[in-house]
């Protein structure tokens, strides 16, 4: 979203909440443009930049996918709150594992995963789709506090025998890792039913009766039924062993495969060929499946509801979340603002500001808010009168031909807001009788104009 213009347009109270606070907000944050861009970059339809070099990732076959691995590491490194394990498991094999530690139960682990290797050029459906969906879940959920740990895993060497996931699952079992569910995404972009129409939006969940895999399917279906998705589920039991979830079944972990419907014979006709390209992907279908998988991970992850939205008036930024601790940040310099640790903050200059909100063990960052009142015109002297000055009791403000709501903010000399009022008529009085003597600044703001007046209280 473009917060720059909205700062000017929304005036008295704007709430910025592009960051998610509820499961529905998480669903709404899944961005098809972002998914499409990742797909096109990761299948070499367009160039991308990896380690400052412009590159084309056309092929991701096992012996030829270092660049693809580097791309994934770079994408994940852009995110906060995760640690990356670049896991070399044999001479050419390399899993990319990103972990977001749970705030309450860090030992409870849920995995969302996909293989990123391929058998031919492009291979958009198999499995750039699953890879892009994992990256999108990471992009959204890494901004959130979650009770449980989420592992975003991208496997290598699936196509040569599930080698990457086998290595990881065996190691996890050996360590006694408490993995409670593994959501494996493999081929989730093709929906070709009813040629010439939009398809039937059926997708498969493949399960077998290993550990809690059937319960896990029920949980996914519960999420499917709790929110609105343009999807129709086909449960496949006994499900296929032919993807990475079966590495976890082999180690007695709960796991499912989710993807397009092989069960109804509606898989891509370009399977394992270089005809499997971006142009064959049903983007709305892929979008819906990514919303579902991201919503499921947010649900089992235990989304903690810290409101990291920020409200804004012409003078003040206020964190929506009450009863927390706060640190305001200057986004332009990426630095904390000394002393700015209240729920509200009054910037002294235009700029981009964010707030870090800590509630219990949970810290979330708001987005950067553009704070810019300098774009407003000043009131002309003929349009406004502020009198008497110096003032003892009532300060009168007269605005000629006023027809809109106007904000009055009175600050003391230290910049602290001491009085706030709005007027919709032409004349108003501010009672300053009970304020200490001294110098004050009155800020008067309409949607188009602003003025600041030095007032002396006697
Ligand atoms: Zn695959």
Predicted features along the sequence, with ranges:
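C-terminal outer-membrane/trafficking sorting elements
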Residues: 325-333, 341, 345, 349-352, ...
């Amino acid at each position: 979203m473009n917060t720059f213009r909205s700062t000017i347009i929304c005036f008295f109270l704007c709430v910025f909440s592009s960051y998610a606070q509820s499961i529905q907000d998480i669903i709404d944050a899944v961005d098809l443009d972002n998914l499409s861009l990742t797909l096109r970059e990761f299948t070499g339809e367009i160039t991308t930049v990896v380690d400052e070099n412009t590159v084309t990732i056309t092929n991701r076959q096992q012996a030829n996918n270092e660049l693809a691995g580097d791309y994934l590491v770079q994408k994940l490194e852009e995110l906060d709150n995760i640690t990356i394990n670049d896991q070399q498991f044999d001479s050419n094999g390399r899993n990319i594992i990103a972990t977001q530690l749970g705030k309450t139960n860090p030992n409870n682990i849920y995995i969302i995963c996909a293989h990123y290797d391929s058998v031919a050029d492009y291979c958009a459906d198999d499995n750039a789709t699953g890879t892009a969906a994992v990256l999108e879940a990471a992009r959204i959920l890494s901004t959130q506090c979650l009770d449980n740990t989420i592992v975003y895993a991208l496997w290598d060497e699936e196509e040569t025998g599930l080698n990457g996931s086998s290595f990881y699952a065996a190691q996890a079992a050996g360590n006694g890792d408490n993995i409670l569910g593994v959501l494996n995404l493999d081929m989730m972009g093709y929906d070709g039913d009813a040629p010439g129409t939009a398809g039937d939006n059926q997708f498969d969940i493949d399960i077998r009766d290993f550990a809690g895999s059937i319960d896990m399917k029920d949980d996914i279906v519960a999420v499917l039924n709790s929110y609105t998705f343009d999807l129709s589920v086909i449960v496949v039991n006994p499900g296929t062993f032919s993807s990475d979830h079966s590495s976890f079944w082999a180690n007695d972990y709960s796991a499912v495969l989710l993807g397009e419907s092989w069960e109804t014979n509606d898989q891509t006709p370009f399977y394992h060929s270089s005809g499997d390209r971006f142009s064959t992907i049903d983007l709305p279908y892929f979008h819906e499946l990514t919303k579902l998988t991201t919503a499921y991970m947010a649900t089992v992850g235990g989304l903690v509801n810290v409101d990291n939205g920020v409200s804004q008036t012409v003078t003040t930024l206020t964190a929506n979340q009450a009863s927390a601790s706060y640190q305001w940040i200057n986004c332009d310099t990426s630095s904390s603002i000394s002393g700015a640790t209240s729920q509200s903050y009054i910037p002294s200059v235009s700029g981009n500001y964010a707030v870090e909100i800590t509630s219990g063990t949970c810290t979330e960052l708001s987005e950067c808010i553009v704070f810019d009142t300098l774009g407003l015109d000043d009131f002309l002297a003929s349009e406004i009168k502020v009198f008497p000055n110096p003032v003892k009791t009532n300060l009168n403000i007269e605005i000629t031909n006023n027809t809109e709501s106007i904000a009055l903010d009175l600050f003391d000399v230290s910049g602290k807001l001491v009085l706030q009022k709005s007027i919709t008529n032409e004349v108003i009085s501010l009672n300053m009788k009970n304020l200490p003597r001294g110098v004050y600044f009155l800020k008067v703001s309409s949607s188009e104009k602003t003025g600041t007046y030095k007032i002396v209280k006697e």
